[in-house]
Amino acid sequence: INTAIMKTLDRFVITDWFIHLQDRICQAIEKTDGKGVFEEELWQRPGGGGGRTRIIQNANIIEKGGVNFSQVHGVLPEKIAQQLQVKGHDFFATGVSIVMHPFSPLVPIIHMNVRYFEVSSGEQWFGGGIDLTPIYVDPAQAQYFHQQIKHTCDLHDHTYYETFKKWADDYFFIKHRNETRGVGGVFFDRLGATADISLYQRFEFVKDIGNIFAPIYTKFMEENKDISYGKGEKQFQAIRRGRYVEFNLVYDKGTKFGLDTDGRTESILMSMPPEANWLYNYQPFPGSKEAATLAYLRKDVDWIGVA
């Protein structure tokens, strides 16, 4: 029998790990940026729990970024209990949520979320995901991003990458634009214990996903920060950031859950870019690098084999 199955896991162990993950990621981003310092705001949720919101603004590479930790508990609203199809109404949720918006249109936007959820009726599960939103798709970097994720997934289960990559393609999709938010990544939810996989093993997977964020993103920051760009690239960045806003306000489950459970609005909306633009009926010039990027924003791209 696998000894990992025998290990006990409770909400305090999970919460503690998430707190340290927030610390480590903030340190890595600050070190690579070279100028920015995260400002911390501690907050309490009236219904129970609270969190640590950490924001970096007007730094060297990062224009606006957030690394949020939260641990909330209380009574689950009826509407959400029905959506989650759970019987219990007392819930506990903890996790880390990250979004980085760089100044340069050549440094990609990145998002990661790792979370744990339990309900008084006994259900327990992990969820999360990591996805990359380049303003201009660099196939080699998209390939590297997916290779790192696939390697991490394969350490745990050879079906994870393909399953969770498809889930990300479907989830990070802006239906009214018929385009993906970026080059995707992985997305997963309701990862609980099964006959073959313990909750502890699920946690080990989530930890490994959390741990790849800093090495991957600091690499992209370093590689792309000094590439020159002009007004045209900044205009396209503002349009692509607008798409990011559309996804977050219309489709993002975390945004909906946070607002529906009286979460902290400023923390929930920290994923918003500092500036965005909605140029009416924007169409890129045929053959332009903007057109090339838009051609990549579709589901089922084999990013491992793309470059």
Give the positions of each predicted feature.
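TerminUS-proximal long segments
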Residues: 265-307
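Compact, glycine/acidic-enriched structural inserts
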Residues: 120-165
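An amphipathic alpha-helical core segment
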Residues: 165, 169-187, 222-267
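Gly/Pro-rich turn-and-neighbor structural signature
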Residues: 7-85, 194-230, 234-244
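Short, Lys/Arg-enriched N-terminal segments with co-localized hydrophobic residues
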Residues: 1-5
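Glycine-rich, often proline-containing surface loops adjacent to acidic residues and nearby aromatics
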Residues: 66, 92-95, 124-133, 179-200, ...
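Internal mixed beta-strand/loop scaffold within catalytic domains of large alpha/beta enzymes
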Residues: 53-127
